[in-house]
A protein has these predicted regions:
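Active-site clefts of carbohydrate-active enzymes
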Residues: 64-66, 275-297, 325, 339-375
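Active-site-adjacent "subsite" loops/lids of carbohydrate-active enzymes
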Residues: 65, 69-77, 157-206, 210, ...
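Catalytic domains of carbohydrate-active enzymes, especially glycoside hydrolases
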Residues: 81-108
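Aromatic-lined substrate-binding rim segments of carbohydrate-active enzymes
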Residues: 100, 104-154, 244-270
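Aromatic- and acidic-residue-enriched segments that line the glycan-binding/catalytic groove
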Residues: 108-123, 158-184, 220-243, 290-299
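Active-site neighborhood of glycoside hydrolase catalytic domains
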Residues: 202-203, 210, 215-218, 222-293, ...
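Substrate-binding cleft of secreted/luminal carbohydrate-active enzymes
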Residues: 306-310, 314-331, 350-426
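Pro/Thr/Ser/Gly-rich low-complexity, intrinsically disordered linker/stalk tracts
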Residues: 415-444
Length: 444
């Protein structure tokens, strides 16, 4: 639609120039008019989003979550078969990056040196898998076989999604209960405490040091989503650590900022090639809170979760951003098209990908063509902006299950050809050394 309007404008401009030249046969005027036309055409083209139907490089990710119980209590060999089947299906659908949840509740779906095995794996927190295996190491190896990136997904502050859940005796909570706060029916690390930040950095250090991950990934859970009628219980922490702040909201944002910066420095200090990515809630700020915000009316990263995502990107503390734009096109409070355009103009010079909800995409019809779902229009919007380098599918199982023929569409149309992941050249601008003195080695 936009390109069509621009073409009409250029045609009208050309007609005007030709008409004027008929009546003003002056060489100097002719040159001026042709130059003006050229400048206007170039200027307009620079403002128009230019899509690429089959990009050579594009982030095509998928989240594999543990918290929905899809792994819990499944025998080891059977679970390995399920994961291999999922990866094969996702590879066929053109997915080139897997974001795998390894730390849902200060626990582990890997052989952690500090935290207990996750109840989402074995059914009971602290219970060792039998026979013993390491899901993260297994997934890394399987992803590498398929030329997929592996992003280790951790939740930094969350400890209990329900106070009814039991923590293993070796859980850090039992050693330092003073580090934690209860909010609603959940338990969290207190983001204000230096001890909380140091501990989370220690966990990331362990993962990055011992595992060949391509990235550390965090989603939208920073300060918890607001519970109606309850303020987060951090008055004591504010009294102790809030010096220099008169506004508690600014102080809370600062607490998260410090963690994000420390995690960036931690990862860079161990393996500079490992990326650090964030997948925040889909609205940064509404216009009613900030004139620079989006024309939306919903919960906000900045004001409600105290996550200043644009600052993190601007300062170079994160290496990519995947806002969760899970709404449909035409949503009254959070329109997909409005948000994609907003994020595209606020990438802050960091790779930007769009988090897509598979169920929501296939559930709603295209407003301009009710006979089809919204996938074609969403993909066109995503690829229309040069600042958007791909997307990530929520959730992997929905793709594998081919909900609404989503996987079929990826294979036949949108991921018809494989794509390399985008280049993160700001992380390392040095080319690898030339290969020297290669030798043939025969193996049995």
């Amino acid at each position: 639609m936009v390109v069509g309007k621009v073409s009409e404008f250029i045609g009208s401009l050309y007609y005007l120039c030709v008409t004027l030249l008929r009546f003003k046969n002056i060489m100097k005027l002719k040159n001026y008019l042709l130059l003006l036309a050229l400048l206007l055409v170039v200027g307009v083209r620079a403002q128009v989003p230019s899509g690429n139907k089959y990009p050579k490089r594009e982030f095509r990710g998928a989240w594999i979550q543990a918290v929905n119980g899809q792994f819990r209590g499944i025998p080891t060999e059977r679970l390995k078969q399920i994961l291999i089947s999922q990866l094969n299906s996702l590879q066929e659908a053109g997915i080139n990056a897997i974001i795998f949840q390894v730390r849902p509740e200060a626990d582990a779906l890997y052989a952690s040196q500090y935290e207990p095995w996750s109840r989402f794996l074995t059914g009971t927190q602290g219970q060792t898998p039998s026979p013993m295996w390491d899901p993260m190491q297994f997934m890394i190896e399987e992803c590498q076989k398929r030329n997929m990136e592996f992003h280790a997904w951790i939740n930094p502050y969350r400890v209990k999604t329900s106070l009814k859940n039991k923590l293993a005796p070796e859980h850090i909570y039992h050693q330092h209960p003073e580090w934690f706060v209860t909010y609603g029916d959940q338990l969290y690390f207190d983001p204000a405490l230096p001890e909380s930040r140091e501990y989370i950095c220690k966990i990331v250090t362990d993962i990055v040091s011992r595992y060949d991950v391509d990235a550390i990934h965090m989603d939208d859970y920073f300060y918890p989503y607001p519970v109606n009628g309850l303020d987060f219980p951090d008055n004591a922490s504010f009294a102790r650590y809030g010096g220099g702040f008169t506004n508690k909201a600014d102080w809370r944002r600062s607490n998260v900022n410090v963690l994000i910066k420390k995690l960036h420095e931690t990862i860079r200090g161990i393996k500079p090639w490992v990326k650090f990515g964030i997948s925040p809630f889909g609205i940064y700020r509404n216009q009613k809170s900030d004139p620079l915000g989006s024309n939306t009316n919903g919960l906000q990263n900045y004001d409600d979760l105290y996550a200043d995502v644009l600052l993190w990107a601007r300062e170079g503390w994160i290496d990519y951003n995947i806002p969760q734009v899970y709404w449909e096109i035409g949503h009254k409070a959070a329109d997909y098209e409005t948000l994609v355009k907003w994020w595209a103009t606020h990438s802050e010079n960091r790779p930007l990908f769009i988090g897509q909800s598979v169920p929501k995409t296939v559930q709603f019809a295209d407003p301009q063509n009710p006979s089809i779902n919204q996938l074609p229009r969403k993909m066109a919007l995503q690829r229309a902006y040069q600042t958007i380098g791909g997307s990530c599918q929520w959730y992997a199982a929905a793709v594998v299950e081919n909900q609404g023929r989503y996987r079929d569409a990826l294979i036949s149309e949108y991921h018809k050809y494989p794509a390399l992941v985008p280049v993160f050249d700001f992380m390392d601008d040095k080319a690898p050394d030339k290969v020297r003195k290669m030798k043939k080695v025969w193996t049995e």
